Amino acid sequence: MKKVAVLLAFIVFGGLYAQNDFKKSEEQIKRLPHEKIAVGVAGGVLHDGKIVWTCSSGFSDVENQIRFTPTTLTRVASIAKPMTAIAVLQLYEQGLVDLEAPIQDYVSDFPVKEEGTITVRHLLNHSSGIAEYASKKEAHGADNYATLTEAMNVFKNRELLEKPGIEEFYTTYGYVVLGVLIERVSGMSYEAYMQKNIWDKAGMVNTGVEKVDVAYTNKSLLYDRNKNGKIKKVKGSSDLSNRVPGGGLYATVEDLLRFGQAVLDHTLISETSTALMLEEQAVKYDGNPYALGWFLYSQSGERKDVFGHGGSQKGCSAQIMLVPKRKAVVAILSNTSGGWGDVIGASVTLINDAGLYDDNDVVEK
């Protein structure tokens, strides 16, 4: 996911919401296809355990005029990362993983690096020094990997960008290593572990690992918007098997809301572990700090006021934001890459429209 700096202002809490309070949000959702920023998009708000509003616009398949809805399956890109982070923290809670231990304690075939020791924490907070994709071929998913270990083998012998634990270098590959850790420690495949311990527990009935050889019902086609604003259907397989734990999942906007709720009500990990997960990390960073699997957006002095994650890859622009004090989650999911900046802006409109923030605060990401 490309990092972009944007200033976003939240408004004062406006009291109880009603369906017509989401007029601006609905306009934002409909604007994205109308202005050809996205082909299809859906957004939603969850409050106090209930989905109180959803809206969608555009198409999941333009040629066949199939509408994009809140239950349309599409990629979620890097929103896979907080799901994977929580899985690691579940193993931590069980005493099976030490966050300060070298990764080789759990993934013995990951090489020891001359630059320094990579710990589990370093992988979770992107300070491992592992680089992102080395080529367009890797970034666009031209090859298929049968296992996460095969995917890890592509990059495991490369030099690090920096000594581990010093600076945030956002990398999906670090989360691939965490996926291998989950498999080795749990004795289950990544997909099976996530299904049993994350998606089923959160009530996420339409979430899974994207596979190029599976024909999905109700899954959106993929579209890409180039720098000139022209949108085309993504050609080829665009295989995600080289990044599954960090960006290889599909879901619906409703499932993203359910995931956020499971985080807020501590269905997946304890309140203590949640607090640990949201601690600001002692590393250099550019823009908003990264905790363990989440960006911390608030600048009110309490970083945990608003946290979330975005996602951008071929055929996807996505954002989820959680507002714990309001027991609220907002999410937007689009089937078109190249429009993530507009998606995060629309996400803040959802928060504002629902009156889910109570300080004149500024969020930067």
Q: Each predicted region: which residue ranges?
A:
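Bacterial Sec-dependent N-terminal signal peptides
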Residues: M1-F22
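Catalytic loop of the DD-peptidase/beta-lactamase superfamily, centered on the K-T-G motif
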Residues: Q19-S56, A142, E183-S186, A192-K196, ...
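Extracytoplasmic/secreted proteins, especially bacterial periplasmic and envelope-associated proteins
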Residues: K24-R31, S78, M83, A87, ...
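Short active-site loop at a secondary-structure junction
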Residues: L32-A42, E63-N125, E162-Y173, V244-G247, ...
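Extracellular/periplasmic catalytic domains that process cell-envelope and extracellular macromolecules
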Residues: I37, R67, D98, K113-T117, ...
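Generic structural signal for alpha-helix termini and adjacent loop/cap motifs
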Residues: S60, Q94, H126, R158, ...
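Active-site helix/loop module of the DD-peptidase/beta-lactamase fold
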Residues: R75-I79, E93-S135, V180, V185-L222, ...
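Catalytic-site signature segments of enzymes, centered on catalytic residues
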Residues: S135-Y216, K235, N242-L257
